[in-house]
Amino acid sequence: MMRASYLFTSESVSEGHPDKVCDRISDEIVDLFYREGPKAGIDPWQIRAACETLATTNKVVIAGETRGPSSVTNEHIEHVVREAIKDIGYEQEGFHWKTCDIEILLHPQSADIAQGVDALQPGEVKEEGAGDQGIMFGYACNETPDLMPAPIFYAHKILRMIAEARHSGVEKVLGPDSKSQVTVRYENGKPVGVREIVVSHQHLIPDMTSAQVRERVEPYVREALPKDWITKDTIWHINPTGKFYIGGPDGDTGLTGRKIIVDTYGGAAPHGGGAFSGKDPTKVDRSAAYAARYLAKNIVAAGLADRCTLQLAYAIGVARPLSIYIDTHGTGKVSEDKLEKAAAEVMNLTPRGIRSHLDLNRPIYARTAAYGHFGRTPDNEGGFSWEKTDLAEAFKRAV
């Protein structure tokens, strides 16, 4: 049985965190292939990308496997990378969008992998299989309007609000690199307040003190959190090391796929281990995790549970999921068996079915690279389609 009263902590990192810079670059390259493919007459279903990025002092290295239009040259990729770094805001001596060295090591996808992933020609019976084996989890709960756990939801919100102020020019002395951490107090299983707040934020004036940084960031923290959650007993940790002038890849080397808990549920739910960024949606690490969130969110949105964890499992080259598992943590209005059966009925959970249902063969991935892949608002370009609750009624009928 779940404890009634406890503390739970989640962290977030900003778009300027070194690992997130790499996630953004990797996803920009995925988007580039999806933008340029149709222009070259290539079917979006045939696009493939698995792109890893390393960023360090004045150096970016990109490696991986791709399949797409020959019009995507290294010069094209380099331009996209520099624009991404510029948009994040890096114009520092140790990492500048104009002058950093960019090395590109992309090559075609393995034929051995392709033969198990690609569908055959029209009229043949084999359906495309999963791009790899693995387990993926989705989760939803009714703690926030977006059906996300409160700690990660508010950790993201704090940094997103500060980033918006920085981009608008209001906070010119703050740099791109930052981290947040929120310890939420639960009573009777519900979030009711914040015990501890951590914000470490890069500053562009070398001798800024922690107190001066707090003057800048505290208003955004207070605006991000529910009004009565911060009290006189709330403990603040703002730039607790005292100085955060050297930031981004100049301060710490970044890699794609290193912030998988930040990307998902902040530790409030299991994680299958696979990262998202840099991967086209034939990689079920990404697409099936999106589908699992979509199904879990719709179960909660339908009022069939207050909390829902959903697991999917796949084998490389095999289309159907090997298993579907649902746990409603004692909050379900119907049995988990019925929900598992309903999940298989309301959505085609083959890799192709997921890509089709969620319309994933499009350039929608760079926007997911920071502030979480879940708990976001679906946009007009098709981004965050897995956050829709349009299956809620179908679930109600199916159970």
From Swiss-Prot:
Q: Does the keyword Nucleotide-binding apply?
A: yes
Binding of Mg(2+), residues: D19
- Please share the entry's free-text remark on the cofactor: Binds 2 divalent ions per subunit.
Q: In which pathway does it act?
A: Amino-acid biosynthesis; S-adenosyl-L-methionine biosynthesis; S-adenosyl-L-methionine from L-methionine: step 1/1
| Residues reported in the UniProt entry to bind ATP | H17, D177, S178, K179, K243, F244, D252, R258, K259, A275, K279
Which GO CC annotations does the UniProt entry carry? Answer: cytoplasm
The enzyme's main class, written as a single word, is transferase
Give compartment(s): Cytoplasm
Sites binding K(+) sit at E52
Which NCBIfam families does the record cross-reference, listed alphabetically? Answer: metK
Q: Which family does it belong to?
A: Belongs to the AdoMet synthase family.
Q: What does this protein do?
A: Catalyzes the formation of S-adenosylmethionine (AdoMet) from methionine and ATP. The overall synthetic reaction is composed of two sequential steps, AdoMet formation and the subsequent tripolyphosphate hydrolysis which occurs prior to release of AdoMet from the enzyme.
Cite the PANTHER family for this sequence.
S-ADENOSYLMETHIONINE SYNTHETASE (PTHR11964)
Q: How does it assemble?
A: Homotetramer; dimer of dimers.
Output this protein's name: S-adenosylmethionine synthase
Species name: Bradyrhizobium sp. (strain ORS 278)
- Organism lineage: Bacteria, Pseudomonadati, Pseudomonadota, Alphaproteobacteria, Hyphomicrobiales
